[in-house]
């Protein structure tokens, strides 16, 4: 059996492949299952270069709502992560199906294809992850700072960020 993420043989250990992971594997879309979170939501890791094709496939599958997109710095000097929470919303669903997608990118050249063209709600969320962490969402139509001034230097939410000209504010007691 081949791992669809690395094209290497997998071991038959306690690796959990959920329903969506099996569906993506059936359609030969590269990914790596990361198990489920505390709510039972399946989590998958996708390579940056596979992000666009997997996003289109998930939209076709029925994930019509981008609940959130966020990003974080994994470790000082390490990689950056972009996280997507997608929901399959239907009129008669009491418990809509959800999935979490994680994309890890190198800190030196953090590029991910934009999903704005699939889910318009990604607009401000991708701009925020660019503004705070410097992740470039390729083909985003308005990728510019959204929270910080355009003249701001650096990426404030990176763990190795040093605040320029920072002065500690003293309490006035």
From Swiss-Prot:
It comes from Cycas taitungensis (Prince sago). This is NAD(P)H-quinone oxidoreductase subunit J, chloroplastic. It is found in: Plastid, Chloroplast thylakoid membrane. The keyword Zinc does not apply. Disulfide bonds: none annotated. GO terms for cellular component: chloroplast thylakoid membrane. It catalyses: a plastoquinone + NADH + (n+1) H(+)(in) = a plastoquinol + NAD(+) + n H(+)(out); a plastoquinone + NADPH + (n+1) H(+)(in) = a plastoquinol + NADP(+) + n H(+)(out). Pfam families: Complex1_30kDa (PF00329). The keyword Cell division does not apply. Gene3D superfamilies: NADH:ubiquinone oxidoreductase, 30kDa subunit (3.30.460.80). Its main location: plastid.
């Amino acid at each position: 059996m081949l791992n669809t993420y690395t094209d290497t043989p997998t071991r038959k250990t306690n690796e959990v492949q959920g329903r969506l992971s099996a569906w993506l594997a059936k359609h030969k879309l590269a990914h790596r299952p990361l198990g489920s979170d505390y709510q039972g939501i399946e989590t998958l890791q996708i390579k940056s270069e596979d992000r666009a094709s997997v996003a289109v496939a998930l939209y076709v599958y029925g994930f019509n709502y981008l609940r959130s997109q966020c990003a974080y710095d994994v470790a000082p000097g390490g990689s950056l992560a972009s996280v997507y929470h997608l929901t399959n919303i239907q009129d008669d669903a009491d418990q809509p199906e959800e999935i979490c997608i994680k994309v890890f990118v190198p800190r030196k050249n953090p590029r991910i294809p934009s999903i704005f063209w699939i889910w318009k709600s990604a607009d401000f969320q991708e701009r925020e992850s660019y503004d705070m962490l410097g992740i470039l969402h390729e083909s985003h139509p308005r990728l510019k700072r959204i929270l910080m001034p355009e003249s701001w230097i650096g990426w404030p939410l990176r763990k190795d960020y040093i605040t320029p000209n920072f002065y500690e504010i003293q309490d006035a007691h």
